[in-house]
Amino acid sequence: MRNKAHNFPNQNNNKLEGEPRAKAEYASKRADGTTNTHPQERMRASGERSDFF
């Protein structure tokens, strides 16, 4: 059954406000295309940050 029939909210009008959460310091690749080092530490730091919503 389609979402309209179940009265789901219209998700086309949802806009994300503010800056994106993705930060370069947590990215798996650098701007020049090389791979960042210490992936386990990056993933842990990204998961522990509190700058969301």
Swiss-Prot record:
Biased composition annotated in UniProt, kind: Basic and acidic residues: 16-32, 39-53
Keyword Hydrolase: no
Compartmental location: Spore core
Superkingdom of the source species: Bacteria
UniProt keywords, alphabetically: Sporulation
InterPro entries cross-referenced by the UniProt entry: SASP_SspK
Pfam families in UniProt: SspK
A Gene Ontology biological process term: asexual sporulation
Broad class of where this protein is predominantly found: other
Region (Disordered): 1-53
A GO term from the CC aspect: endospore-forming forespore
Induction notes from the record: Expressed only in the forespore compartment of sporulating cells.
Keyword Nucleotide-binding: no
Protein family per UniProt: Belongs to the SspK family.
Protein's recorded name: Small, acid-soluble spore protein K
Gene of this entry: sspK
